[in-house]
Structure formats: structure tokens, C-alpha cells
């Protein structure tokens, strides 16, 4: 293999591909490598991890002198290319090594046998017409993911359905992005008609999707179909620019959540987000950012009082004005870190709280952002 390639184009690709690999993975070392494949008129770059695989196609600003393929350590290759100043780079396989050459630089990198690279789940014979598909505006999708991502569970020991975002298009009229760690629940609604579907995208894959920054307002395309081998998974291809992602979604049913929002509140209040946010941040500082710390919230017709007691450190009392109040007085124990995560997702400065009582979950919304609904379970 021998190619001439534009450094800027190569840098853009490697920067994103580097978000896929796991550097110095001693258990699965092949997850640290890139596969580079030069064909007659294009170059394909491959990378994978235990969750998904990625293919990037480049067919401009290249000159393919010899076809072939090689495998190279991903991070060091990315760092070396990033440190080169010249714009035109020669990449060549020579004596089972990778030669990176410019006018003033010559670097040799060890490679491994191509056959040692795990099978990439990209089949060039795939007929995409056999897949169901839908498109979402990329900016809108990323906006929704960022607003609810804090509710995704980081605990890999619980059910995997809580380690990602559920894409719920089951009614064919809207797409609901749903995330929960069983204590927090966040739902973002995208009004778009589609064929009915329902699948979960794992959090590492979502982080990779979030890393794109398209120059134009583009769409991301999701292709999906039930795996031919079993009914327990959904085969997916996700296309964005010149990248294609291969992913298998395990068909673990996400809980039905829309009915959680349908209750008659006993107490309703409206507060200023920034005032509440500042108070919660001070409490978190006192608690030394301990995410399992609990405090008490008292609600009456004029104010919301939050009392925090931290053993061996101190205590605090925060008073937040209620812009509106309807219903009964309440006293609730809650996690300030979780509440802070929820309210920071809103852009509006007026936040609505609907309470069912002292011990039941409560709803957090904003009239100016009806597409976002969030729930927090009180702590005992």
C-alpha cells in the first residue's frame, strides 16, 4: 500500500476515529488499532470497540499509488500525524512496517497482521433498501441528547437498558428520547412522523455521535432491522457525512414512561432557575460534591427552603422565592446533585415543579420548553 494524502483531511478523520478506540487496552489490544484500506479510488479507515464499529470513507485529496491494507496503533499514529507540519504526507507499507514520510520527516511504525484485526461488521453487499430508516436533523438530535444525557446510568451492573438512551418512535408521530437511572427520568420530544420503531443506543455510541460538528445543518440517517439470527437484537447502521457506524442494539424493553407525566398535582410551584441553581451549587460545595448526599426541602406559599447538614463540616439553609404557588405545604428529602442536573438542562429561567405529595416522584418542566420533561424520585 502506498498513498499520498492531505494532512488536514487525514487529521479530521483521525481525530474522530481516536474517539472510538481504547488506547493501551491490554485485555482486547485490537481495540487500540486502526485498519487502513486503500482501494482503487478511495481509502477506508476502520476502528472498533466493544460497543460499536466505525468506517470512514475518503475519496478526495488523495493519490493512491498502490492498493493494500495495514493495521497500526491508533493513538500514536494520530499523535504523529498531528505533529507533522507539511500538508502532503506519504503513507506506505514497507517490510511489514508503516512508513510515514514528508519532505523533512520519515517515521516507521510497527504494524500487525491484517487477519488479527477483528471482523468489522460492514458488508459492502448490504442492500440498504432492506432496512427501515429515518432521518433526524443532527443539531436537533444532539440538543436532545445533551439535555437528557445526565439521566443515563453510569452503573454497568444494572440492566443495560439504563446505560443508554431509548429512541421511542412507537406511535409513528413523535420520537421520544428517553433516559433513566431509575432515580432520574428525562424525556425529550422530537415531533417527526416515522415508521414505528423502538431501540436503545448505548452511552459510548452517543458520545461519539455528539463529537461530530458539521459545518452545515445536516441530517443523520438511522438504518435498522431485526437481526436475521434472532429476535433479541436490532442490526443498525448510522450514517453521518462520510462516516458509517455499525451497531447492534439489544432488544431489552425500556419501561413505558409517558404515563408518569399524567397525574393531578397536589402542589405546583414556579421558581427562578438561576436562584435555585446557585443555592444547589453552594450546597454541593458544602457536601464536597458528594453525589449521594441528601438534603431536605420545605415548600410553602412564599418560598422553598433547602436545609443541608454535612457531618463534621457544617450546615446551610437556602431560601428560594416561589414566583407561583398552588396547593399544600410539602417536606421532601432529595438528592441536590440530581436536581441540579435536571434544572441545568433547561434554557428558560422559569422552572415549574408539580408535586404529588411528600414521598412520590415530582415533575420538572418549563412552559417555554414543552419538549423536555423530567422526573426526580424523592430520597428516603
UniProtKB/Swiss-Prot annotation:
**GO cellular component assignments:** cytoplasm; DNA polymerase III complex
What's a Pfam family this protein contains?
DNA_pol3_beta
Coiled-coil regions, chain positions: none
Keyword field contains DNA-binding: yes
| Record-annotated membrane-spanning stretches | none
What's the stated role of this polypeptide?
A: Confers DNA tethering and processivity to DNA polymerases and other proteins. Acts as a clamp, forming a ring around DNA (a reaction catalyzed by the clamp-loading complex) which diffuses in an ATP-independent manner freely and bidirectionally along dsDNA. Initially characterized for its ability to contact the catalytic subunit of DNA polymerase III (Pol III), a complex, multichain enzyme responsible for most of the replicative synthesis in bacteria; Pol III exhibits 3'-5' exonuclease proofreading activity.
Q: Which NCBIfam families match?
A: dnan
Family listed: Belongs to the beta sliding clamp family.
The annotated subunit structure for this chain is:
Forms a ring-shaped head-to-tail homodimer around DNA which binds and tethers DNA polymerases and other proteins to the DNA. The DNA replisome complex has a single clamp-loading complex (3 tau and 1 each of delta, delta', psi and chi subunits) which binds 3 Pol III cores (1 core on the leading strand and 2 on the lagging strand) each with a beta sliding clamp dimer. Additional proteins in the replisome are other copies of gamma, psi and chi, Ssb, DNA helicase and RNA primase.
Could you identify this protein by its name? Beta sliding clamp
**Species of origin:** Mycoplasma genitalium (strain ATCC 33530 / DSM 19775 / NCTC 10195 / G37)
Q: Taxonomic lineage of this organism? A: Bacteria, Bacillati, Mycoplasmatota, Mycoplasmoidales, Mycoplasmoidaceae
Protein's gene: dnaN
Amino acid at each position: 500500500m502506498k498513498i499520498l494524502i492531505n494532512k488536514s483531511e487525514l487529521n479530521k478523520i483521525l481525530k474522530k476515529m481516536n474517539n472510538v478506540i481504547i488506547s493501551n487496552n491490554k485485555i482486547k489490544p485490537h481495540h487500540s488499532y486502526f485498519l487502513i484500506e486503500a482501494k482503487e479510488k478511495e481509502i477506508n479507515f476502520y476502528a472498533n470497540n466493544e460497543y460499536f464499529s466505525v468506517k470512514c470513507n475518503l475519496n478526495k485529496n488523495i493519490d493512491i499509488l498502490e492498493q493494500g491494507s495495514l493495521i497500526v496503533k491508533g493513538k500514536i499514529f494520530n499523535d504523529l500525524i498531528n505533529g507533522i507540519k507539511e500538508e502532503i504526507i506519504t503513507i506506505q507499507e514497507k517490510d511489514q512496517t508503516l512508513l510515514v514520510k514528508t519532505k523533512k520527516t520519515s517515521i516507521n511504525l510497527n504494524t500487525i497482521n491484517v487477519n488479527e484485526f477483528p471482523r468489522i461488521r460492514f458488508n459492502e453487499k448490504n442492500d440498504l433498501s432492506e432496512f427501515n430508516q429515518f432521518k433526524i436533523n443532527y443539531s436537533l438530535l444532539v440538543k436532545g441528547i445533551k439535555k437528557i444525557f445526565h439521566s443515563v446510568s453510569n452503573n454497568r451492573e444494572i440492566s443495560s437498558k439504563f446505560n443508554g438512551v431509548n429512541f421511542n418512535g412507537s406511535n409513528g408521530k413523535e420520537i421520544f428520547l428517553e433516559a433513566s437511572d431509575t432515580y432520574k427520568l428525562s424525556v425529550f420530544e422530537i415531533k417527526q412522523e416515522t415508521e414505528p420503531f423502538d431501540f436503545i443506543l448505548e452511552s459510548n455510541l452517543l458520545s461519539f455521535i455528539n463529537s461530530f460538528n458539521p459545518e452545515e445543518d445536516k441530517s443523520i440517517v438511522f438504518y435498522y432491522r431485526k437481526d436475521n439470527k434472532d429476535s433479541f437484537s436490532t442490526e443498525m447502521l448510522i450514517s453521518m457525512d462520510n462516516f458509517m457506524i455499525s451497531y447492534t442494539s439489544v432488544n431489552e424493553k425500556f419501561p413505558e414512561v409517558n404515563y408518569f407525566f399524567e397525574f393531578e398535582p397536589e402542589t405546583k410551584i414556579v421558581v427562578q432557575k438561576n436562584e435555585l441553581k446557585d443555592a444547589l451549587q453552594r450546597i454541593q460545595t458544602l457536601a464536597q460534591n458528594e453525589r449521594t448526599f441528601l438534603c431536605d426541602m420545605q415548600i410553602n406559599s412564599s418560598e422553598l427552603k433547602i436545609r443541608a447538614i454535612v457531618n463534621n463540616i457544617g450546615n446551610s439553609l437556602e431560601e428560594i422565592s416561589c414566583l407561583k404557588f398552588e396547593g399544600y405545604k410539602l417536606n421532601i428529602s432529595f438528592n441536590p446533585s440530581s436536581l441540579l442536573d435536571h434544572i441545568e438542562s433547561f434554557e428558560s429561567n422559569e422552572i415549574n415543579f408539580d408535586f404529588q405529595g411528600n414521598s412520590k416522584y415530582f415533575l420538572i418542566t418549563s412552559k417555554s420548553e414543552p419538549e423536555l420533561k423530567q422526573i426526580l424520585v424523592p430520597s428516603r
